[in-house]
Regions:
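Polar low-complexity intrinsically disordered regions enriched in Ser/Thr and small residues
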Residues: 7, 15-16, 50
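Intrinsically disordered/low-complexity terminal segments and short unstructured peptides
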Residues: 8, 27-28, 39, 103
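Intrinsically disordered, low-complexity serine/threonine-rich segments
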Residues: 13-14, 207
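Bacterial N-terminal signal peptides
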Residues: 16-28
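Bacterial Sec-dependent signal peptides at the C-terminal "C-region" and cleavage site
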Residues: 28-34
Length: 310
């Protein structure tokens, strides 16, 4: 080798330096992209802990944590880049104290809970993720499992009356007639009996004044005495004795939340029904009403396909 030939730095010496720099760059990039996701609610229950841990497992690149509502400052004192997830009505009441604050996802809030607090308005930087199954989906479920029915009975009270317009709009393209009856006093059975006499099936609303543990027995016995099925209002009611309902479980909500958190907060919807869902049916009730067995998975797939079709 010539004495004046330049010496080359051995590759073996340069490689560790290159890998070190690349690793530091990767860590810096990941740290810059990590989001601060704050879940809050009035109580730190085992269910809340399980949900938080499941979201942490889905988003290991982010800082996902739960903080009890009582430990937080007012919303306008939180960092603006925090992504806030509210888990219950008390946390929504806290968020509504201030107009300013971080972008907020209100998880699993019912239409009634929102209407009582907001009316028809949706404040800026709030995204309301409805816990109710959309009425259009529930009516499609009726068409799938009870294709012969035409008159759909709906009980309502002063709290849920505002939902009737949406139900009627959803029923019209399906050729279904909505027959409604006001039921302000659940101890008076006459409105229920009157409605059952004028309808082919009963569609339950997510209205706890009408559908609750105290009214469930009367609702179900009265309906089935007239050979009328009850659809909805929830999976819990199906377990109690209604025929069927669409619903979204924790896995569905985790997937929905995960998808939203991947998006810029400016693109979050103002309101959103759960796009992922399942169907639950009560086969014993189906048999007692002389209804063909319901394949819940197949019906859910058919409903989802219909919603995604242009």
């Amino acid at each position: 080798m010539s004495a004046d030939q330049p010496r080359k730095t051995p590759l073996r010496g340069r490689l560790p330096l290159f890998l070190c720099l690349a690793f530091v760059s990767l860590l810096t990039t990941l740290d810059a992209r990590a989001a601060e996701i704050l879940l809050t609610g009035a109580q730190d229950t085992p269910g809340v802990q399980s949900f938080t841990q499941a979201l942490q497992a889905r988003r290991p690149q982010d800082n996902v944590r739960f903080a009890p509502l009582a430990s937080l400052p007012s919303p306008d004192r939180l960092p603006g880049d925090v992504r806030l997830v509210l888990l219950d009505p008390p946390s929504l009441d806290w968020r509504l104290q201030k107009n300013h604050g971080p972008a907020t996802l209100v998880l699993r809030i019912s239409r009634l809970q929102a209407y009582e607090r907001l009316g028809e308005a949706t404040p800026e930087r709030l995204s309301l993720l409805w816990s109710d199954p959309p009425m259009a989906r529930q009516l499609q479920l009726i068409r799938r499992v009870l294709p012969q029915v035409r008159r759909v009975g709906v009980l309502f009270d002063r709290h849920s009356e505002f939902l009737l317009k949406d139900i009627q709009q959803a029923a019209r393209p399906l050729g279904l007639e909505i027959v409604s009856e006001r039921w302000d006093d659940s101890s008076d059975n006459r409105p229920l009996q009157n409605l059952l006499g004028r309808s082919d099936v009963l569609l339950g609303l997510d209205d706890p004044d009408l559908y609750n543990p105290k009214t469930v027995k009367n609702l179900l016995l009265s309906s089935y005495a007239r050979q009328r099925a009850l659809i909805g209002p929830s999976a819990a009611f199906v377990r109690a004795g209604s025929l069927a309902s669409t619903y979204s479980d924790q896995d569905d909500w985790l997937a929905i939340l995960d998808e939203l958190l991947d998006r810029p907060t400016a693109s979050w919807p103002r309101t959103l029904y759960p796009v992922r869902f399942k169907v639950m049916s009560n086969q014993q009730v189906a048999r007692s009403l002389g209804i063909e067995p319901i394949d819940a998975e197949a019906v859910a797939a058919q409903l989802a396909e219909g919603e995604h079709r242009p």
